[in-house]
UniProtKB/Swiss-Prot annotation:
It is a multi-pass membrane protein. It holds the Pfam family NfeD. Keywords: Cell membrane, Membrane, Transmembrane, Transmembrane helix. Its main location: membrane. The chain crosses the membrane at residues 1-21, 46-66. This is Uncharacterized protein MJ0826. One of its GO terms (cellular component) is plasma membrane. It is found in: Cell membrane.
Length: 138
């Protein structure tokens, strides 16, 4: 059996392994093995060059699959910190009111006196409330 067929078979097996053990980026390795196997079948005399090409393609494919792994993902209210919203009501004496940000309405708390229509910056999160401050010059 030619070595190219072995690489193609290995590529399919590695891709199938993703169905058994998901989340380990096996498809990237499988695609690289498939590409390398096809190249070996088409031009076997250039095995070394095709290995280098397959290695580069593997790095590119893995980068696409793995990009973003390890980055901190902000979920819930934390994703709004640093963004600007608009007050949709006058804030009460206790400092609570509602703001609109990204077409969502959130409960907010502030030490500033905030009126309906004022722009506010989200500076933090406390429980389910956003902590805001009035944007200067508004």
């Amino acid at each position: 059996m030619e070595i190219g067929y072995i690489f193609i078979l290995a590529g399919f097996l590695v891709i199938a392994l993703e169905a058994i053990v998901p989340g380990l980026y096996f498809p990237a390795w499988g695609i690289a093995l498939l590409i390398y196997g096809v190249v070996l079948l088409i031009i076997p005399q250039y095995a070394f060059i095709s290995a280098i090409i397959a290695g580069v393609l593997t790095i590119i494919i893995l980068h696409k699959f793995v990009y973003g792994v390890g980055k901190e993902i902000k979920v819930g209210a934390e994703r709004f910190v640093g963004m600007i919203g608009i007050a949709i009501e006058d804030f009460e004496e206790n400092g609570y009111g509602r703001i609109k940000i990204e077409n969502q309405i959130w409960l907010a708390k502030s030490k500033d006196k905030i009126k309906n229509g004022d722009k506010v910056e989200i500076v933090g999160v406390e429980g389910v409330s956003l902590i805001v401050k009035k944007v200067e010059g508004e």
